């Protein structure tokens, strides 16, 4: 249960397996964001338990979640616009030559080399790692954010609407990167309203309604209309899937 601005939202008896790509879908207010905030350490449940990799966890902050191997790609990307690509990938994880009291000297060459390796592993090509991310396109910025998450979040990556603000070609590139993560056996949870994308990228869909997961279905066994019926609670004949794509 979570309290935010006098509003209560409960997530009850819900579980998601690992080693798969899973999408979370549901109408606004269904509990998707609350669920994500809880597993990424942004908010703490007032009661109940969260288990990760078979162990109970109590994340007090996003840092706790990251230290457990959970990385998040937010809609706003959480990038530092005035820093270059390498500095963003190593944000909070800088490699130091040595420290002298409050002063530290960064090993920028090692950071740049490692950044190139992480980008290559994710299938991303960026010619100049010294450019500020503010000068990059939305798709390139998203690629940097995903590469950073994939580099440090080997146990789970959570993506919030990963292509919401991108054009057709940039969306295609980001989707290719997400598929690359599957080939690397990196589990991913995607929050999305785009059912076409969901069916293309994930193995299972967790449908949220009224603060709980009401069903988890395999994309190979259902249609878009089936999922819309679960989202709305209506017979699938009463609403067209196009309204959710």
Regions found by a protein language model. Name each.
Residues 25-27:
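The feature captures the beta-strand-to-loop junction immediately N-terminal to the Walker
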Residues 198-200:
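A short, surface-exposed alpha-helical micro-motif characterized by mixed small hydrophobic
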């Amino acid at each position: 249960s979570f309290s935010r601005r006098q509003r209560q939202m409960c997530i009850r008896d819900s579980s998601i397996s690992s080693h798969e790509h899973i999408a979370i879908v549901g109408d606004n207010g269904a509990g998707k964001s609350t669920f994500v905030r809880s597993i990424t350490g942004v908010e703490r449940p007032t009661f109940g338990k969260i288990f990760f990799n078979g162990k109970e966890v109590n994340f007090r902050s996003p840092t706790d979640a990251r230290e457990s191997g959970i990385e998040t790609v937010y809609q706003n990307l959480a990038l530092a616009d005035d820093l270059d690509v390498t500095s963003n990938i190593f944000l909070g994880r800088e490699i130091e030559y040595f420290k002298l009291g409050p002063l530290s000297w960064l090993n920028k060459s090692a950071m740049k080399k490692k950044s190139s390796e992480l980008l290559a592993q994710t299938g991303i090509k960026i010619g100049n790692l010294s450019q500020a991310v503010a000068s990059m396109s939305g798709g390139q910025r998203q690629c940097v954010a995903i590469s950073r998450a994939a580099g440090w979040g080997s146990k789970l990556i959570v993506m919030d609407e990963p292509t919401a603000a991108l054009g057709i070609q940039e969306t295609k590139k980001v989707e290719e990167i997400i598929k690359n993560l599957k080939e690397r056996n990196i589990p991913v949870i995607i929050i999305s309203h785009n059912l076409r994308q969901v069916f293309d990228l994930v193995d299972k869909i967790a449908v949220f309604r009224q603060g709980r997961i009401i069903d988890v279905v395999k994309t190979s066994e259902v249609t878009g209309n089936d999922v819309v019926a679960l989202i709305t609670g209506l017979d699938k004949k009463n609403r067209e899937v196009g309204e959710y794509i």
